[in-house]
Amino acid sequence: MPPIKRQPGGWVLPGYKYLGPFNPLENGEPVNKADRAAQAHDKSYSEIIKSGKNPYLYFNKADEKFIDDLKNDWSLGGIIGSSFFKLKRAVAPALGNKERAQKRHFYFANSNKGAKKPKNNEPKPGTSKMSENEIQDQQPSGSMEERGGGGGAVGSVGGGKGSSVGISTGGWVGGSYFTDSYVITKNTRQFLVKIQNDHKYRTENIIPSNAGGKSQRCVSTPWSYFNFNQYSSHFSPQDWQHLTNEYKRFKPRKMHVKIYNLQIKQILSNGADTTYNNDLTAGVHIFCDGEHAYPNATHPWDEDVMPELPYETWYLFQYGYIPVIHELAEMEDANAVEKAIALQIPFFMLENSDHEVLRTGESTEFTFDFDCEWINNERAYIPPGLMFNPKVPTRRAQYIRQHGNTASSNTRIQPYAKPTSWMTGPGLLSAQRVGPAGSDTASWMVVVNPDGAAVNSGMAGVGSGFDPPSGSLRPTDLEYKIQWYQTPAGTNSDGNIISNPPLSMLRDQALYRGNQTTYNLCSDVWMFPNQIWDRYPITRENPIWCKKPRSDKNTIIDPFDGTLAMDHPPGTIFIKMAKIPVPSNNNADSYLNIYCTGQVSCEIVWEVERYATKNWRPERRHTALGLGIGGEENVNPTYHVDKNGKYIQPTTWDMCYPIKTNINKVL
């Protein structure tokens, strides 16, 4: 507490009566503005002392008012007094003023920040602790920030963020936030990576017994990787229902991946006993191929994606790539062309890139930007050819040639049958799958057959089947419908899902040609002017992106399965166990047997647009009433678990909640 008995004149600055501590409350008229502010300050201190608090040890409202009173006073006393209490504000705790304490907290927090970055009001991934209202407030400005490429990655090299053993480097994040302009999905999985290929690169020839000459060459590597390329990895069934019922279009904008809480363990075998010990010095190699310098790994429809269920362990797949068409590099009969191709086979070693080596308890992060099209969720309720008023007569006439003779006539076209300038989209339907059951040959195939090469296995050996090439045409056979399995290979529970028509009038089109007496179907429709169509409708089970090949030329890019083709999709994040050699008598290639587990979180910002309609009538929406019943006792609904913990997968296309089936659009 301050002294009860003050000094007669106080400890004031020379020439002042109140500018200083312990002076009397009544010491005559103040000499100037600074002295007058000091007198008011002393009276406020006296009131605080009477309330039982010590104003000298805490920054308080009287100090704040004194600083404000002297903000435009440039006298010597004013400068000294103001500077003193500004210093007190910076270092002393606040007295009974939570707002001031919070500002002081932010003052020190901001002082530890790095360099300023350009402002951008777009919500960022990593908003785990934000409320939905706070995310709603983060609306974008008129122009989005400049992005250098569509799928770059930002991550430190040479040492990740970390902490000591026993201290977490991040918490579990999950859930989604929905606003008018953005949706943020957050997911975390426990992953496990182990030693692959004995830390070696190997060339493997894949020659199935039933492939009819189809074979493949693969370079298998000691690396594994993360694949986030599927909607079901990010949206729960309810979140996907929310998205497709309320938004007319959406697309990914940013993705943030964090790999943390690493635990590296050594496997020790002693006879029948196996012990798992923490290894605090072993490491894992991690890097992101943001420039796509290595062969693509995140191929659409692969099984290696992040598990749908948050409690499932993500066992990372081994990375491998195809270096050459195997049939063209066998060098049969000393073929000169095949020898030239074989001599050009590339060999990619991922250790040829800078990367981090992390230990137990450390973490790393990567951020990606997307540059892609919108996924449109609206269905056309009429085709473009019916965009007219059928009650109004037309000035158009048509020429009619009579069958069997040279007579002809002109007649006015009826108001309800006006012609259109808009044609169906392109597609190919004049083929069927080739080969016996289990064949790997598709209905359409693209081959590479260099002049002079010896191809003995047939075109299947140098060809690649491609997705059902129906374009926007109505599939005539099952060969032209996209099908997939919901269950992993080898589970003996294969049940394929067949895509159904979305009932959009800009899909499932057909082109017919008249010949005086009837119309004939044109199975193959090429690219022409004025073709109008919608992209293939996706479901929650579809991939998000596919990498557009690097080429000199291309036509319109429209993947047959509705994925987003990107020049720069998110770079693949590679990971492998560090090789720790151990001595041996004969210098054999021996090493510690270790593995790594940890958490990986993936947060994506999706740009969205809510639907708005003038349609009076209710529209169809995805509901739980369209789902099925399954499980061990056939009493559990889709997207639930049975008594054995088995997850009930959807069994039909409609259960996967496809887009372009609910919201009507005006063309």
Swiss-Prot record:
Intrachain S-S bonds: none
Key words, A-Z: Capsid protein, Host cytoplasm, Host nucleus, Hydrolase, Lipid degradation, Lipid metabolism, T=1 icosahedral capsid protein, Virion
Gene3D superfamilies named among the record's database cross-references: Parvovirus coat protein VP1/VP2
Swiss-Prot/TrEMBL catalytic activity: a 1,2-diacyl-sn-glycero-3-phosphocholine + H2O = a 1-acyl-sn-glycero-3-phosphocholine + a fatty acid + H(+)
InterPro entries per the UniProt record, alphabetical: Capsid/spike_ssDNA_virus, Parvovirus_coat, Phospholipase_A2-like, VP1/VP2
Any Gene Ontology biological process: lipid catabolic process
Region (Disordered): 107-159
UniProt superkingdom: Viruses
MF term (GO), any: structural molecule activity
Pfam families: Parvo_coat, Phospholip_A2_4
Biased composition (Gly residues): 149-159
Domain notes: The N-terminus of Isoform Minor capsid protein VP1, VP1u, contains a phospholipase A2-like region. VP1u may play a role in the disruption of host tight junctions in the airway tract.
Similarity annotation: Belongs to the parvoviridae capsid protein family.
Function per UniProt: Capsid proteins self-assembles to form an icosahedral capsid with a T=1 symmetry, about 26 nm in diameter, and consisting of 60 copies of three size variants of the capsid proteins, VP1, and VP3, which differ by the presence of an N-terminal extension in the minor protein VP1. The capsid has a channel at the 5-fold axis and there are densities extending the 5-fold axis into the interior of the capsid. The capsid encapsulates the genomic ssDNA.
Descriptive protein name: Minor capsid protein VP1
Gene source species: Human bocavirus 2 (HBoV2)
Record gene name: VP1
